[in-house]
Amino acid sequence: VQWSAEEKQLISGLWGKVNVADCGAEALARLLIVYPWTQRFFASFGNLSSPTAILGNPMVRAHGKKVLTSFGDAVKNLDNIKNTFAQLSELHCDKLHVDPENFRLLGDILIIVLAAHFTKEFTPECQAAWQKLVRVVAHALARKYH
């Protein structure tokens, strides 16, 4: 994947403002609420019975932060995303058996969260760069499935 200087700047510029804990928690919570079938991968997280329970669940919050922290690895390694996510792809495929479609869904949710948090900075150009990034990350995570 080729990244223009402008795309790199739009991605890293916005990333520098992201509160990883808050945005990660919100993104994962939204995934579990909007796409309830994804909850089956998080059975060990306890109470996921309602949006309120999900939003208040400390395990959802912690894992959301973990997910978005690893997303930061993509931002730091834009030219090597495939290798950056090789181990995570293996884990999600071989051990967790996560449907790779969920990576795309989470990417789309992250776009929504970023747009909600950064209304002024999240221009159409910024969205295009981030949409490309979440697509590349989802593809890298799904790589082990092919």
From Swiss-Prot:
This is Hemoglobin subunit beta. Pfam families: Globin. One of its GO terms (molecular function) is oxygen carrier activity. Heterotetramer of two alpha chains and two beta chains. Red blood cells. Involved in oxygen transport from the lung to the various peripheral tissues. Residues 2-146 form the Globin domain. Disulfide bonds: none annotated. GO terms for cellular component: blood microparticle; haptoglobin-hemoglobin complex; hemoglobin complex. GO terms for biological process: hydrogen peroxide catabolic process. It comes from Struthio camelus (Common ostrich). Keywords: Heme, Iron, Metal-binding, Oxygen transport, Transport. InterPro entries: Globin, Globin-like_sf, Globin/Proto, Hemoglobin_b, Hemoglobin_oxygen_transport. It comes from the Eukaryota. SUPFAM superfamilies: Globin-like. Heme b binds at H63, H92. Belongs to the globin family.
